[in-house]
Structures are given as C-alpha cells and as structure tokens.
Design a protein with these regions (language model features):
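Extracellular glycan-interacting surfaces
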Residues: 1-121
Length: 121
C-alpha cells in the first residue's frame, strides 16, 4: 500500500514579532531561519501599548490597543504593515444605559481580528 504524500507547508519568507510595551510598539522582522532581524520603531512613543496583532486575513493589517496619556484608551490600525497608522474614530466604549450613565473603559488589553470568512471593514 502506497503512502499518501505529505502535505506541503509553506515556509514564510519572513517572521514578524510585534512587541507592545509601556513605551510604545516595536516591530522585529526576521528571515525565515530567524538568524537576521531588523528593528523598527518605536511607534506611539511614550504611550502604553497593551496589545498588537497582525490580521492573518491579509498579512498587512496590524491592530494596536494603546492608552494615550491624556485621551485614554484607543485602537490604532495600519493597513501597510505599520508604516502608517490611523486612530479609530471612536474610542472603545461600553453601551450606555438609558439615563446616559455606564461603565468607562480604562484600557483595552486584547484585540482579535475578524474571522477568515468575514470581510475586512
């Protein structure tokens, strides 16, 4: 009985590591063998970045959850692998009660890109 061929797994040409810190966001990009690395950043210098994640649906979009010193929590989005960033139009927020009261978001500690079947918007 012949064995089925092993599936081929694509080896990435580069590896990207997003490092979120209390001082900003750094990006390390390395070759597939992880022997050579380039450091870029910081992005959002002086702001606390709680989480950063690349969207696997396109490989270019990055989301970053940050807490700016005076404006509070926000989410930034890059569609060019971190070369430029756009801040969300509205900060993260809980739904308000009918009387206008409600809880306040202190920080966003985790972001999850949409499912592979969902459109990017």
């Amino acid at each position: 009985m012949a064995r089925a061929p092993k599936p081929r797994i694509a080896t990435p040409r580069r590896v990207r590591l997003l490092v979120a810190t209390r001082k900003g966001l750094w990006t390390l990009t390395g070759d597939a063998a992880r022997r050579s690395w380039k450091l870029a950043g910081p992005q959002f210098l002086g702001h606390i970045v709680h989480h950063a994640v690349a969207d696997p649906r396109d490989g270019r979009t990055i989301l970053a959850a940050a807490r700016t010193g005076h404006l509070g929590p926000t989410v930034f989005r890059s569609t060019d692998s971190g070369k430029s960033w756009k801040e969300a139009q509205q900060p993260p927020a809980f739904a308000k009660k009918a009387d206008g009261s409600g809880r306040v978001v202190d920080h966003t500690f985790w972001l999850t890109p949409g499912h592979a079947s969902e459109r990017d918007s």
